[in-house]
Amino acid sequence: MIKERKTELVEGFRHSVPYINTHRGKTFVIMLGGEAIEHDNFSSIVSDIGLLHSLGIRLVVVYGARPQIDANLAAHHHEPIYHKNTRVTDAKTLELVKQAAGLLQLDITARLSMSLNNTPLQGAHINVVSGNFTIAQPLGVDDGVDYCHSGRIRRIDEDAINRQLDNGAIVLMGPVAVSVTGESFNLTSEEIATQLAVKLKAEKMIGFCSSQGVTNSEGGIISELFPNEAQARVEELEAQGDYNSGTVRFLRGAVKACRSGVRRCHLISYQEDGSLLQELFSRDGIGTQIVMESAEQIRRATINDIGGILELIRPLEQQGILVRRSREQLEMEIDKFTIIQRDNMTIACAALYPFVEEKIGEMACVAVHPDYRSSSRGEVLLERVAAQARQMGLRKLFVLTTRSIHWFQERGFTPVDIELLPESKKKMYNYQRRSKVLMADLG
């Protein structure tokens, strides 16, 4: 027998090895819509998921059931009800949702369990675990419309999920979750996948749609989108009446996930064999990645940044979280400020007021844009301000806060008496605000 030399295989393997090493031990959340599950290529997707598991990747698979639920409703002559593009899940619908989700769970579990059959890894056992890892709560009533059993996530037991992942299991999550009162609720797969990815600090969230990612006006694949660009694409699709396609649902979740610390979100096709492997183990991938903007920078503020700082801090001032600062005051103190900017938008700021004689500094006016509070921007600012204080020869750093006491305590600050403040600061202390004083050694 003459063996054929396949140089493409050799080159492909050489290129994939670094990614195999990089991905091992990382957590990936995979979102499978009902459209992907009923497609002929689904068996290949399941096999590829099994392969990822065999490479040491920690996998959470979240499945949806939208087309299966709609088919169930049609078969039972029960008209689907939507309000603001969200399904209203009445009692009859809930039973049909549970039926569809239950059948899919059994089917996916069975397929994953035998996904390595007819491969060199045949005989390797895959544990697939499902459970009440999420607690739901009702969406409630909106504009007089009761969403009934449509819900959202209240909390996630990430410790229990991590234990299963540590034990080598694939965690499988469906669209039905229970509340603390024992009621069942219908949730969207994109919300479950997004919140799981954030809570588990996943390296990646991966979704499937009918096309190979997001396309441009000429039909070409856009290989990378920043969250702001992905959000603009969502708004564009919604303006065209597209609220529930696989693309728009995944992009909504990907924007939130990226802004909350998930490094990369990948959108690929469920129709093309091998999309998952090509996306993860090749240099250029095959679909669209949503990634954090590379233009982010942390720097000292200038007079041109005052407008952005004011826009960031005004809502917090109105809520009484920050002390109000006028534009004139900001102009005089702008050299005290450090900002984090993304795409020319100020998303975080903090100021350092040194008291040189006492060798102590105050970190003040700490603010982070709501879209970025789940990430590490506050810690980045704290590290930068502490470094600036050390360069000035300061030995201690203090803050006055009414709301963020625990956050600072978790980062080495301890509550102290007002008497430990610098004399000039002590005279300005506002006893009506009753801010707590916390202090840390700079070392």
Curated annotation (Swiss-Prot):
* Pfam families per the UniProt record, alphabetical: AA_kinase, Acetyltransf_1
Protein location: Cytoplasm
GO process annotations (BP): L-arginine biosynthetic process
Q: How does it assemble?
A: Homohexamer.
* Annotated catalysed reactions: L-glutamate + acetyl-CoA = N-acetyl-L-glutamate + CoA + H(+)
What is the species of this protein? Salmonella typhi
The parts of the chain that form a coiled coil are none
Q: GO CC annotation: what is one?
A: cytoplasm
Query: Which EC number(s) does the record attach to this protein?
Result: 2.3.1.1
List, for all copies, the residue spans of the domain called N-acetyltransferase: 296-443
Q: Which family does it belong to?
A: Belongs to the acetyltransferase family. ArgA subfamily.
Any one GO MF term held by the record is: L-glutamate N-acetyltransferase activity
Under the heading Gene3D superfamilies, the entry gives: 3.40.630.30, Acetylglutamate kinase-like
What UniProt keywords apply to this chain's record, in alphabetical order?
Acyltransferase, Amino-acid biosynthesis, Arginine biosynthesis, Cytoplasm, Transferase
Q: In which pathway does it act?
A: Amino-acid biosynthesis; L-arginine biosynthesis; N(2)-acetyl-L-ornithine from L-glutamate: step 1/4
For this entry, the protein name equals Amino-acid acetyltransferase
Q: Does the keyword DNA damage apply?
A: no
